[in-house]
Amino acid sequence: YDPIAQVWNKFDGATGKVVNISDAIGYPMFMESYDKPAPAPAYGIAGWTADGNNVFLYDAYDWWKIDLTGERQPECLTKGYGRKHGKSIRKMTSNIDKDVFQKDEKVIVSLWDKDTMDEGVYQLDMKGRLRKLMEGNYVYTIHRFSDNHEYCVWNRQNVSEFRDLWWSKSDFSNPVKVTNANPQQADYKWGTVKLIKWTNYENKENKGLLYLPEDYDPQKEYPALVQFYETHSGELNIYHAPLLSSALGDPMYFASNGYIVFMPDVHFTVGTPGQSCYDAVVSGTKYLIEQGIAHPGKIGLQGHSWSGYQTSYLVTKTDIFTCAN
């Protein structure tokens, strides 16, 4: 991968010739949302065919089969399904995942919805056919398949469900929960989370996570904590075990103690990170005020390290926050 030209190349060791193999795809092969002052990295390689004549490359959504002999044009193995449905299709990690695929290979892949943040576990064959195995408002992790490939141990999580282990057949049918590692959660008030969207001061859609107390009453006023570090919306279905921290505060700890926690995504324009932060964080906070969720005089701001700099910037530009850390 050439990060400056943002293309994939093949190199012929016999002739020393370098040939661009990704321009013909027609979609960017680099991370388009990359907002750091450095060349954007590639989405990556999924694997190779067993004969070594083809490589599978990722774009933002799909798999592309590239013929390294140059005889055939790039082919979208997943037939554009990911882009059409807004889902990123990626190989899942396990003890049996491979980088080299036989013609009859069936690969376990994740389909992650970039809008809802839900995830599905699918089977992808080398003809591009997808078969759904399980799906939901979870993040799934595969731990291990049995040596005979008949059974599997895996887990799932979301904001209220701990990462307990599950056992099932290798196609994830007949699942059985085999651990209950966090029973003490039932003894505490917990919380909920939802993905919210608003228009920021750059006139772009902005996303963020809003954590609410378990017994949230929209008729009452709650103290609100606004905290951020780059992006958070992709963490919608991540379980947070309450803990103390010297960096960002744990959202479920605060929600359990009667706080609203707002974690907006911040996307940066290179060279003006402070203003980018202002456009996202302040617009999102004012959106919550307009919706009657947050209330002036009861809004705190929290940032750490890189977002600590941005917090220092924000308090020189607005008085919307009662206190800042």
Language-model region placement:
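Serine-hydrolase catalytic core recognition
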Residues: 141-325
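Extended, charged coiled-coil "arm/hinge" scaffolds of SMC/Rad50-like chromosome-maintenance ATPases
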Residues: 123-126, 133-146, 152
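Beta-rich catalytic cores
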Residues: 42-44, 117, 138-141, 161
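Repeat-solenoid scaffold signature
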Residues: 3-8, 34-76, 307, 313-316
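C-terminal/domain-terminus segments
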Residues: 64-92, 126-135, 273-281
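Beta-strand C-termini and the immediately following turn/loop, strongest in propeller blades
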Residues: 1-4, 12, 47-48, 54-62, ...
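Surface-exposed loop and turn segments in beta-propeller and other repeat-based domains
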Residues: 16-41, 77-99, 180-194
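Surface-exposed loop/turn elements that mediate protein-protein interactions on large endomembrane-trafficking
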Residues: 11, 16-19, 72-77, 121-133, ...
